[in-house]
């Protein structure tokens, strides 16, 4: 599993902690939805292409024939490596040479495409989804012609790694990027505190619906109260 000792300890502590209290929610929404996909060491965000205008996220047009796009951000050396070493992990944390954005395109629904992953469905407002798309667009580094710069093949689906903005480090990693994206979209998440995949998923149960879980989570609070909502 990819990861670092410090974040792993935090994940273990969070797993043993009681679940966060769930406050009464606003009126449930019918979408648009995004999906948080836990890959064990980091969390990606899957978006349905038909819900996002390419004028807001123009780079998505490259994969216009696919129903979903999943995105994630990370270190330029560590993230594209199928089996990252401890040495690469330490280098990413303390001597990162840059960052990349991974984009994967696919047609099956996220629960089917990522058949073994923990998944949380999050309902956004239309404005929230547009703000999320702007956040993703702003993460690309563009060339002189205004096009994204592909630097490596993607890990799954059809896609690629693209040169990205931002400096990767221990407290500014793939999971804090995902948490910031959710915060920009209007979700009540502590972006600075969610530095592990477990931390992001733990926070997201406050406002999302668990599609596929893992101990110790439950989808519906025992006391019948509802979730918070993204604005």
PLM feature segments, named:
Residues 39-41:
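A short, compositionally biased
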Residues 22-33, 37, 48-163:
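Non-catalytic ligand/cofactor/substrate-binding and regulatory segments of enzyme domains
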Residues 14-15:
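C-terminal motif of bacterial Sec signal peptides marking the signal peptidase cleavage site
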Residues 1-6:
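Bacterial N-terminal signal peptides that target proteins for export
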Residues 44-46:
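Short beta-strand scaffold segments in enzyme catalytic cores
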Residues 18, 138-231:
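Activation targets extended, charge/polar-rich intrinsically disordered C-terminal tails
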């Amino acid at each position: 599993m990819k990861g670092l000792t410090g974040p792993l300890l935090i994940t273990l502590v969070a797993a043993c902690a009681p679940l966060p209290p769930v406050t009464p929610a606003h009126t449930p929404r019918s979408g648009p939805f995004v999906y948080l996909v836990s890959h064990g060491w980091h969390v990606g965000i899957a978006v349905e292409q038909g819900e996002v205008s390419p004028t807001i996220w123009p780079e998505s047009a490259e994969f216009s024939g696919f129903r979903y796009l999943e995105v994630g951000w990370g270190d330029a050396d560590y993230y594209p490596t199928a089996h990252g070493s401890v040495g690469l992990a330490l280098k990413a944390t303390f001597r990162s040479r840059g960052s990349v954005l991974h984009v994967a395109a696919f047609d099956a629904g996220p629960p089917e495409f990522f058949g073994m992953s923990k998944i949380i469905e999050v309902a956004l407002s239309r404005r929230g989804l547009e703000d999320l798309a702007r956040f993703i667009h702003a993460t690309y580094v563009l060339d002189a012609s205004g096009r994204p710069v592909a630097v490596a093949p993607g890990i799954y689906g059809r896609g690629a790694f693209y040169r990205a903005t931002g400096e990767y480090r221990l407290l500014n990693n793939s999971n804090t990027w995902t948490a910031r994206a959710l915060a920009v979209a209007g979700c009540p998440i502590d972006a600075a505190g969610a530095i592990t995949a477990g931390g992001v998923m733990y926070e997201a149960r406050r406002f999302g619906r668990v599609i596929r879980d893992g101990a110790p989570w439950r989808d519906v609070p025992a006391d019948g109260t509802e979730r918070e909502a993204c604005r």
